[in-house]
């Protein structure tokens, strides 16, 4: 039996958002660096790590179910992630209360604690194959795109959210460390870098925007300077940079010219949540929808190709029909390209639970459906304008029906797709990770169709 065959094997289940996915990638990278093998099955693993989500009730249940399945199928389970930091009404750890047989429980962003638990229950091999770990680390995404997490935690105290209680206040990564990871990812063949955090706009606030150094030159720990540097680096590799979770602080205006100049994709993911000032105040969010509309108009004047994505909550406690109508009017006037809407769901530990005026489930869901009806009309109208245009598309998948890819307006998993007809000539063949020029021939409310 070879040393590789004898390596202790760890199974891994990763749930939740892209930030949690990055945590999973870091844990798996460290496991491989220490010589552990990763098992794709429960019965092939010596123990299983489950990285959980705990933001909303559905995510909590999904995580608890996944832990239960891992215990049933394997029996040795270490739990990490946001659910690991949640307590029940009595102050007890939720995971251990429901699944007392788990070996260990940690919160999110806890690489050291997870590895300590793994070492305790599955000692590491003496001669790890550190040369098997690429400089870019091990990624759980397709080879052609990757998430780059620039900070951890959040300084906001939105009434509907418990992320700060699970992930803590904002902690920005050193700017040189971020740039080095980005460079390693591009060198590894990544064609699209998705910048994520809980609050991308606040990058560097915690360190007072101190100046770091990258390639011998000063570089401020601040979103604008980081985005410009990432854009310059991406250009050397012909790659994309996409920004997510950008709170609409005033200095966000500074990155729009960078988008228009081609340094980063003209794509802005801005979580607005609502449009009525009273609802926004109850949410403890910035409360000036008129100013937001003015800024959106100004952004589009500077960058006409800008795609704006946002998320909203319908049926927040105390939301009146008039307040909801204000939200619908805002969506129609703002003409946001991509939106998601959630019917409000109470989150244990959130201060919004104490607000008066909780709405019945059916009202919340009915408002969500009405919201999406308006939003999809806007999306269909804006997508129809792209028919006849030629767009640069990144191929995600190739099958017998042709290709499936995404334009600059589409982030993976949350936005639309571009369906591409099979190539008419051998010279037009493409594969996953290729950029191709696609003439758009059709559109619906979410996706595009085209041909090379």
From Swiss-Prot:
InterPro entries: Elp3/MiaA/NifB-like_rSAM, Methylthiotransferase, Methylthiotransferase_CS, Methylthiotransferase_N, Methylthiotransferase_N_sf, NA-bd_OB-fold, Ribosomal_uS12_MeSTrfase_RimO, rSAM
Protein residues bound to [4Fe-4S] cluster 2: 154, 158, 161
The keyword Repeat appears for this protein: no
PROSITE patterns according to UniProt: MTTASE_N, MTTASE_RADICAL, RADICAL_SAM, TRAM
Compartments (UniProt record): Cytoplasm
The keyword Nuclease appears for this protein: no
Any one annotated GO CC term: cytosol
Domain Radical SAM core intervals: 140-381
Keywords, ordered alphabetically: 4Fe-4S, Cytoplasm, Iron, Iron-sulfur, Metal-binding, S-adenosyl-L-methionine, Transferase
MF terms in GO: 4 iron, 4 sulfur cluster binding; aspartic acid methylthiotransferase activity; metal ion binding; protein methylthiotransferase activity
Cofactor note: Binds 2 [4Fe-4S] clusters. One cluster is coordinated with 3 cysteines and an exchangeable S-adenosyl-L-methionine.
SMART domains for the chain: Elp3 (SM00729)
HAMAP family, per the entry: MTTase_RimO
Family membership: Belongs to the methylthiotransferase family. RimO subfamily.
Protein name as annotated: Ribosomal protein uS12 methylthiotransferase RimO
Originating organism: Cupriavidus pinatubonensis (strain JMP 134 / LMG 1197) (Cupriavidus necator (strain JMP 134))
């Amino acid at each position: 039996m070879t040393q590789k065959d004898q390596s202790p094997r760890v199974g891994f289940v990763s749930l939740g958002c892209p930030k949690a996915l990055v945590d999973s990638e870091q844990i798996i990278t460290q496991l491989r660096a220490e010589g552990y093998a990763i098992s794709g099955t429960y019965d092939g693993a010596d123990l299983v790590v489950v990285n959980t989500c705990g933001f909303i009730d559905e995510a909590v249940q999904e995580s608890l179910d996944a832990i239960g399945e891992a215990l049933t199928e394997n029996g040795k389970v270490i739990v990490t992630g946001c659910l690991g930091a949640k307590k029940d009404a009595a102050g007890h750890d939720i995971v251990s209360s429901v699944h007392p047989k788990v070996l260990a429980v940690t919160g999110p962003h806890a690489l050291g604690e997870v590895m300590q638990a793994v070492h305790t229950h599955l000692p590491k091999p003496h001669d790890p194959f550190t040369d098997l770990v690429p400089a870019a680390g091990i990624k759980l995404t397709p080879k052609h795109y990757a998430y780059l997490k620039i900070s951890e935690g959040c300084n906001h105290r939105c009434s509907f959210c418990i992320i700060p209680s699970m992930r803590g206040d904002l902690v920005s990564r050193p700017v040189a460390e971020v740039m080095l990871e980005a460079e390693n990812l591009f060198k590894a063949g990544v064609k699209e870098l998705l910048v994520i955090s809980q609050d991308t706009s606040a990058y560097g606030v915690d360190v007072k925007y101190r100046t770091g150094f990258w390639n011998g030159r000063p570089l401020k720990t601040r979103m604008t300077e980081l985005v410009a540097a990432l854009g310059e680096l991406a250009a050397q590799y012909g790659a994309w940079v996409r920004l997510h979770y950008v709170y609409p602080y005033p200095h966000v205006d500074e990155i729009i010219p960078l988008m228009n100049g081609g340094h980063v994709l003209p794509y802005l993911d801005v979580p607005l949540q609502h449009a009525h000032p009273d609802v926004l105040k109850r949410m403890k969010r910035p409360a000036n929808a008129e100013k937001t509309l003015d800024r959106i108009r100004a952004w589009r004047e500077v960058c006409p190709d800008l795609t704006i994505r946002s998320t909203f909550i319908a049926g927040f406690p105390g939301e009146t029909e008039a307040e909801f109508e204000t939200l619908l009017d805002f969506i129609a006037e703002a003409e946001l390209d991509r939106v998601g809407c959630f019917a409000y769901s109470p989150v244990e530990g959130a201060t919004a639970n104490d607000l008066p005026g909780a709405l019945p489930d059916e009202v919340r869901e009915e408002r969500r459906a009405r919201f999406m009806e308006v939003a999809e009309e806007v999306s269909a109208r804006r997508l129809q304008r792209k028919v006849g245009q030629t767009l640069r598309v990144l191929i995600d998948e190739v099958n017998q029906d042709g290709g499936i890819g995404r334009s600059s307006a589409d982030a993976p998993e949350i936005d639309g797709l571009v369906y591409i007809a099979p190539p008419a000539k051998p010279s037009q063949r493409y594969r996953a990770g290729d950029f191709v020029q696609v003439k758009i021939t059709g559109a619906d409310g979410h996706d595009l169709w085209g041909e090379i």
